[in-house]
Amino acid sequence: MNIQFSFRRFWHVLVWTLVYHWRQLLTLFSAAFVTFVAVEIIEFIQVSNDYAYKIFNHKSHEAIVKGALHDCSNGCMSFLALLMCIGAAFAFYNLHRKNEGRRLLMLPATNLEKFMARWVVYVPVLFVLYVVAFMVSDVLRIVIWPVFSEEVSFPTAIPEFFGVMKYLVVWTSTLHFYKLLALWRKFWLFHALGLFSSVWIGRWAWLFVTIVFFAVTALLLRGNYQGWDVTVFYLLAIVLAFAAYWLFCRFPKYKLFHNKD
């Protein structure tokens, strides 16, 4: 593997990847937008229908609205994690065709630069697109909300959404970082749906391990929490990332092309 890295070549490959994949990115953006609009409308309609009952039970308007915004943000964040997995699964999907693989190999850049360009497009760039999709969907929900209910109105959920975004670090970012590094040379051996399923299962397994880790440390500390377990957790994630990269360099030879044109 040629490990030479040029930022100039990388920039050209990154621009080429963005231009070449704009339709796929637009499709993912549109799917995220529709999903977020649906989640917000369904959540707030349900809260609006139960509004009178909650007020009757002496629950304040502020508490009802805050709870609705929190639940809506958590729901959208969960779907964002799901959409990130879908985007990662389709990052190298087109390499299952001969012409697509040849076109990528003919680019005047190293394999590392080509991979990093795809990683940047389908992880941080796609994440930003999803966040923008949520913000646009939230504005649209505010505009069209009077059509669904005039009894109670809900403010923007954007601040609450950014408040719960910290969970995305555990759910997706670390997972994608070392999963993609370890699996990118094998992506063309799987259908995108199969890859997505494996990543989705891995995401929930990683989340389960995270919950167990913090629960066990909380029980052991019993009130003497110092925050060191968070540091240990992220150090472990970094070690796993480098281990996956080592495996990626250790086993570089895989079948590249299928028989499809």
Language-model segments: residues:
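Hydrophobic alpha-helical transmembrane segments of membrane proteins
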Residues: 1-102, 111-261
